């Protein structure tokens, strides 16, 4: 049959690239599960009353090449001015060796958060290096493995200060007036929900205020001033006030460590260690504290432990502080952090080493000195005598200066009264300084860079002697041996080989949606048109960004059934927080601010109660019935009991039990009946897109995990994006921004992230995904995700009971395998199965969530039938091994499961096990072998012997 031109053009080609099983394989799996077609299967599983009649109209699919060309044209509308705005964002030079071998490498960006340390030793080592950089530069004892951005780190510092404060009746938090305005904005938002009073004043007046539990200082100040805070910090400490300092990595290369001056907490952005500005993100924040406060710190902490053979191994330490365990009692709701960006900063420090970093920092400071000297020589006044990279220059005719800057395609900081701010960076050259002279002084200034350089080199006093660092930094060998590109390339490859990512095998983590992150989706994030924009540049310079964000927002509105979308939250947890704040402020606008009860099902993800607590709500747990569904009788009873104070319910759909609950609309109606709002967690949106939608179901607000459903990669633990969709009545209450006032951001609410659009530079990934899939492709992706999960469940149910199912024994896009009966019979646990899967070349499914003693499997639509069969065969082979233990062939204390995973060195060591080496490392015909580099970790040892900095280099060899 002759094909039509439309068929030959094949505009939907990407759909077949993204979805794993082809049409023939889909039919084979449909036959296996007893369904005629994808539509028939969907019709059996999804409640009829919430099925959409037609898919949301987001356009037809485009080819990879057409979508890239379209987005390139949009990106071309951005104007790439040279930005000296500063305020925590500077241009960088990302070493090409890191760009190519890490940022553009799926071995790094497709990995998951390192909950399974045996398959994560490479990125754990890179994160440990990041912590070491943080410790060396801050002068403190304990560091985390990144937070979301500097502003949210400030809010976390405030919350932590209150937790550790000995002044239990104090309720005021002091913020120095020269912190970055976006930081103050986020601090105020968080303080409101916690009921703290925020005082903003000159740092010198911090001692004038009473009932202060914590103080936030900035080093270097937002307008450039270097402060010697030693005496102030000493006096504050004498009053038992917890002192936090917002700092800058590059400045700390030259300046005295805040920890040495007595600070309790030091945090800041690691952006200028090689991470592009990206119109606001993503960037990793660093966070450090004194050892005595370590158990009150937020975020992931990487610790050094031992494996079962006594070898040094790394793991995430002290997880009992975190939301997935402590829920509403957690230190923070943080789930995803910024691992990929922290690792860029970490490797930037490794590549340059202490000598290279000092050269960069000194060059930046020298050029700043030259600029300052020339301006002062011509009669201009500097606001601050002591500075590192930022000058606050008083100008008589500010409008003329800004006009000359615009003509030269230069951005200066313009929000300072009668002055402009100028922040130099590692990309600044002597030619740039000469151009700045022209902008500030006119063309006839007559200044000579060489002459000025000689003068300032002999007599620079812009950094106080007391503030010059006098201790060595980055002395560990890892920062002093990989400075040639060959060495660096091999070091990064050695780390990558230790890890298991999507470029090697499926990662069947339930509730995580580890789907394909296509190369075409990733390409635009490194385009300079997107990567090099300052988040506070004039809006007319970011028209391409605004068009792309507007289109993406419009698509998400249609896909969710909501009326508006806010792109600011830069993680799913932040999205939850922002959505709950919208609900809180909505109630307040109706004079019902007393509504603070948040109903949460017992099956909920730990971020839900943690976010509710952060939003100032009280959590009331709703029971689930024996089938895993929300108990409607218990819901009605508790909604009625708390009717006067009911704020909302947080519910996930499909449920965290992997089922489309038939009564979801009734749940919404009950909550609405008693005056509450419905927050529908978007964690499982991958089973909704094109089939149903939160708005159609009856919800009022949701966050979307763009790093799950819409293809932003997990990056080994971040970045993420968590925009919120809202119904019209909540739209006035989404986060706003105090620095950037642009269309779509005109709400009067406080910010939840540092930048107006959060991690804007990764939004092109989701734009590309939706553009290339189109309406039909997106629906098909959801349907195949459901098919794949049901195929796995149907083939494994006889070996491992599927804990919860819906109508006709079906599951949604994931299934929970119940390991508890096997454990009772044999002693083999879900942990043993998870570790044994490593020997078969797989990352484990989600363990013991949402039910202890289970494994939750989510294959996504991107995995083909061959990979699904490989996983199923591995699980069946493991079940046969368990039967060997049950039959007494292998003892409970010595078998391939309890000893898993097995490593290469065991092959040549003495072998005393009752099973062969072949069974250990090449079970059931495994051919394409992934080799873990450590055996099972000793979690108890790691937490009892907490060590969170680089170990001797001999331990890595």
Curated annotation (Swiss-Prot):
EC number assigned by the record: 1.4.4.2
Cofactor(s), names only, from the UniProt record: pyridoxal 5'-phosphate
Keyword Aminoacyl-tRNA synthetase among record annotations: no
InterPro entries the UniProt entry points to: GcvP (IPR003437), GDC-P_C (IPR049316), GDC-P_N (IPR049315), GDC_P (IPR020581), PyrdxlP-dep_Trfase (IPR015424), PyrdxlP-dep_Trfase_major (IPR015421), PyrdxlP-dep_Trfase_small (IPR015422)
Origin: domain of life: Bacteria
GO biological process assignments: glycine decarboxylation via glycine cleavage system
Catalytic function, reaction form: N(6)-[(R)-lipoyl]-L-lysyl-[glycine-cleavage complex H protein] + glycine + H(+) = N(6)-[(R)-S(8)-aminomethyldihydrolipoyl]-L-lysyl-[glycine-cleavage complex H protein] + CO2
N6-(pyridoxal phosphate)lysine found at: 708
Keywords for this protein: Oxidoreductase, Pyridoxal phosphate
SUPFAM superfamilies: PLP-dependent transferases
Tagged with keyword Isomerase: no
GO molecular function: glycine binding; glycine dehydrogenase (decarboxylating) activity; pyridoxal phosphate binding
GO CC entries: cytosol; glycine cleavage complex
Task performed by this protein: The glycine cleavage system catalyzes the degradation of glycine. The P protein binds the alpha-amino group of glycine through its pyridoxal phosphate cofactor; CO(2) is released and the remaining methylamine moiety is then transferred to the lipoamide cofactor of the H protein.
Subunit (UniProt): The glycine cleavage system is composed of four proteins: P, T, L and H.
Family: Belongs to the GcvP family.
PANTHER family according to UniProt: GLYCINE DEHYDROGENASE (DECARBOXYLATING) (PTHR11773:SF13), GLYCINE DEHYDROGENASE, DECARBOXYLATING (PTHR11773)
Protein name (Swiss-Prot/TrEMBL): Glycine dehydrogenase (decarboxylating)
Classification lineage: Bacteria, Pseudomonadati, Pseudomonadota, Gammaproteobacteria, Enterobacterales
Gene that specifies this protein: gcvP
């Amino acid at each position: 049959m002759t094909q039509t031109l439309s068929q030959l053009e094949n505009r939907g080609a990407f759909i077949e690239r993204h979805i794993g099983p082809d049409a023939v394989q889909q039919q084979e799996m449909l036959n296996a599960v007893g369904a005629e077609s994808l539509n028939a299967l969907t019709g059996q599983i999804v409640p009829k009353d919430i099925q959409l009649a037609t898919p949301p109209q987001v356009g037809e699919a485009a080819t990879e090449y057409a979508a890239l060309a379209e987005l390139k044209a949009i990106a071309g509308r951005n104007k790439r001015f040279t930005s000296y705005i500063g305020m925590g964002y500077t241009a960088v030079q990302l070493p090409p060796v890191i760009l190519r071998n890490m940022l553009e490498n799926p071995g790094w960006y497709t990995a998951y958060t390192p909950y399974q340390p045996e398959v994560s030793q490479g990125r754990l080592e890179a994160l440990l290096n990041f912590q070491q950089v943080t410790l060396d530069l801050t002068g403190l004892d304990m560091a985390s493995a990144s937070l979301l951005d500097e502003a949210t780190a400030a809010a976390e510092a405030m919350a932590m200060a209150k937790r550790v404060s000995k002044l239990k009746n104090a309720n005021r938090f002091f913020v120095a007036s020269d912190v970055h305005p976006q930081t103050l904005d986020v601090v105020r938002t968080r303080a409101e929900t916690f009921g703290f009073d925020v005082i903003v004043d000159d740092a010198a007046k911090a001692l004038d205020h009473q009932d202060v539990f914590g103080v936030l200082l900035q080093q270097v100040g937002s307008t450039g001033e270097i402060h010697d805070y030693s005496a102030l910090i000493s006096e504050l400490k004498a009053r038992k006030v917890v002192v936090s300092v917002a700092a800058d990595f590059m400045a700390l290369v030259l300046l005295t460590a805040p920890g040495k001056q007595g600070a309790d907490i030091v945090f800041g952005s690691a952006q200028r260690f090689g991470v592009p500005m990206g119109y606001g993100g993503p960037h990793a924040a660093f966070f450090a504290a004194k050892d005595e406060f370590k158990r009150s710190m937020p975020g992931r902490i990487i610790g050094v432990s031992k494996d079962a053979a006594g070898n040094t191994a790394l793991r995430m330490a002290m997880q009992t502080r975190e939301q997935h365990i402590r829920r509403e009692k957690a230190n923070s709701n943080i789930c995803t952090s910024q691992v990929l960006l922290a690792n860029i900063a970490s490797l930037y420090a490794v590549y340059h080493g202490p000598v290279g970093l000092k050269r960069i920092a000194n060059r930046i400071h020298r050029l700043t000195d030259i600029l300052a000297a020339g301006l002062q020589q011509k009669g201009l006044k500097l606001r601050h005598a002591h500075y590192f990279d930022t000058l606050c220059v008083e100008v008589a005719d500010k409008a003329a200066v800004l006009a000359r800057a615009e003509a030269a395609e230069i951005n200066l900081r313009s929000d300072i009264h009668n002055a402009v701010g100028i922040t130099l960076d590692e990309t600044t050259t002597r030619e740039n300084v000469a151009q700045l002279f022209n902008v500030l002084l006119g063309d006839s200034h007559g200044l000579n860079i060489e002459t000025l350089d000689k003068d300032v080199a002999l007599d620079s006093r812009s950094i106080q002697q007391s503030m010059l660092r006098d201790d060595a930094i980055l002395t560990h060998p890892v920062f002093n041996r990989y400075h040639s590109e060959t060495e660096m390339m091999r070091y990064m490859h050695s780390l990558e080989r230790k890890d298991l990512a999507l470029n090697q095998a499926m990662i069947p983590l339930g509730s995580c949606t580890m789907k394909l992150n296509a190369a075409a989706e990733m390409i635009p994030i490194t385009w300079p048109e997107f990567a090099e924009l300052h988040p506070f540049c004039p809006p007319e310079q970011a028209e391409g960004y605004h068009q792309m964000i507007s289109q993406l927002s419009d698509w998400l509105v249609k896909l969710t059934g909501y009326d508006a979308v806010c792109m600011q939250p830069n993680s799913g947890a932040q999205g939850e927080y922002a959505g709950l704040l919208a609900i809180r402020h909505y109630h307040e606008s109706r004079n019902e601010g007393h509504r603070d009860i948040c109903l949460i099902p017992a099956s909920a993800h730990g971020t839900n109660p943690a976010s509710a607590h952060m939003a100032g709500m009280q959590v009331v747990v709703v029971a689930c019935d024996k089938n895993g569904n929300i108990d409607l009788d218990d819901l009605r009873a508790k909604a009625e009991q708390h009717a006067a104070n009911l704020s909302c319910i947080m519910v996930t759909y499909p449920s965290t039990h992997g089922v489309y609950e038939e009564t979801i609309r009734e749940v919404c109606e009950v909550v609405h009946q008693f005056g509450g709002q419905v927050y529908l967690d978007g964690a499982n949106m991958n089973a909704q897109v094109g089939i149903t939608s939160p708005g159609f179901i009856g919800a009022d607000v949701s966050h979307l995990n763009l790093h799950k459903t819409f293809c932003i990669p997990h990056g080994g633990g971040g970045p993420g994006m968590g925009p919120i969709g809202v119904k019209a009545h909540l739209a006035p209450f989404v986060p706003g921004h105090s620095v950037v006032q642009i269309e779509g951001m005109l709400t009067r609410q406080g910010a939840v992230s540092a930048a107006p659009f959060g991690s804007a530079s990764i939004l092109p990934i989701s734009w590309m995904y939706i553009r290339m899939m189109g309406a039909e492709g997106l629906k098909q992706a959801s349907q195949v995700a459901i098919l794949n999960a049901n195929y796995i469940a149907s083939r494994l149910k006889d070996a491992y009971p599927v804990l919860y199912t819906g109508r006709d024994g079906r599951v949604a896009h994931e299934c929970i395998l119940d390991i508890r009966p096997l454990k009772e019979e044999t002693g083999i646990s879900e942990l043993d199965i998870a570790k044994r899967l490593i020997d078969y070349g797989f990352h484990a499914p989600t363990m013991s969530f949402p039910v202890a003693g289970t494994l939750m499997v989510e294959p996504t639509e991107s995995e083909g039938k061959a990979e699904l069969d490989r996983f199923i065969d591995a699980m069946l082979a493991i079940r046969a091994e368990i039967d060997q233990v049950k039959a007494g062939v292998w003892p409970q204390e010595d078998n391939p499961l309890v000893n898993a995973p097995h490593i290469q060195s065991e092959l040549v060591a003495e072998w005393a096990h009752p099973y062969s080496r072949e069974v250990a490392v090449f079970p059931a015909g495994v051919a394409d072998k992934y080799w873990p580099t450590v055996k099972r970790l000793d979690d108890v040892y790691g937490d009892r012997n907490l060590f969170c900095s680089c170990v001797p280099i001999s331990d890595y060899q």
